[in-house]
Structure formats: C-alpha cells, structure tokens
Design a protein with these regions (language model features):
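Active-site helix-to-loop segments that bind/position phosphate- or nucleotide-bearing substrates
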Residues: 1-162
Length: 162
C-alpha cells in the first residue's frame, strides 16, 4: 500500500479478503448477518480505542492515515487497524450461527473479544490492555521523537489464547 493509497490497494485487498472468506458475491456494505457482526465488532474496538486515546488527551478526529472530513474517529480508526483481525477471526468462526439481527449471545461474544489475548511487548495481555499499551507506546514515541518502540499487538488464535 502506497502513501495516501491513491491506487486504493487497501480497499481492493479488503474486497479480495472478504470474498475469499464468504464467496465471490460478498459485498462488504450489504445488509446481512456477516456485515452486521463485522460492524458491531469493529464498533466495540473503535469505542475501546477511542476511550484510550481520549484518556491520553488525543482528539480522535485528527487522524494519521484516516482523514475523513466528517469522521470524528479518524485517529481511532488508525489505531484499531492492528486489532481488526480478531473481529474478522471471530466472525469467520461463527458466521454460520449468525442471524441478520444479532442475538444477545452474538453481541456478548463480540464484546468479549476485548478479553481475548494478544502478545504485546513479548507478554500475553488482554486486547483491552493491548490497546492501552499501543496508545501509551505511541505517546512515548512522540515524546522521544522516535519511530521504533511502538507496541503493536500480535493476535493469538482463540484456541491458543487460553
């Protein structure tokens, strides 16, 4: 992906990714159970990331790569990117059990993703804490004018996370 992604490589890659998982007719913006679950899961992540960013004094509307004029969560969307695979993984693992209107159990499963584990800085931590570590490490990078030291998470498959 190039700077500013003028060739829309990220979008094309996402399209290919979802079609590989759910079939050649899958459209990400369609009104269906899979998209409902993806949207709900991403909203949970976005909320947790926003909470952490605001606690460090960031304005979530001012993004690094996401710069939508009418998006109040550009920075949140930047920071949630490394966590998206955990939602994708859960939805793929559960897509046959989803209904267009998500059940309470579906929603609880997606909310509980914040309690799944990731590796961050060589330690196994909950996703909700990995988010905080990522933001804290970003603050440190800014304060020290260095690019290395950003604690990016490594998502652990659910069956290995226990």
């Amino acid at each position: 992906v190039e700077d500013d992604d003028v060739s829309n490589r990220e979008g094309l890659s996402a399209k290919m990714f979802f079609r590989e998982l759910y079939g050649s007719e899958f459209v990400r913006k369609a009104d269906n159970a899979i998209n409902s679950a993806l949207n709900y899961g991403y909203a949970i992540l976005r909320s947790a990331v926003s909470k952490s960013l605001v606690s460090y004094g960031f304005n979530c509307a001012l993004g690094i790569h996401h710069m939508g004029e009418f998006n109040a969560y550009n920075l949140s969307d930047d920071f949630m990117e490394p966590f998206r695979p955990i939602v994708d993984y859960w939805v793929d693992a559960n897509h046959t059990d989803l209904c267009e209107d998500l059940t309470m159990n579906n929603k609880l499963g997606l909310i509980n993703l914040l309690n799944q584990c990731a590796l961050c800085g060589g330690k196994k931590v909950k996703i909700r804490y990995a988010i905080s570590l990522l933001v804290k490490s970003f603050v440190s990078c800014i304060e020290n004018s260095v690019a290395d030291g950003l604690l990016l998470p490594e998502i652990i498959p659910f069956d290995e996370a226990e």
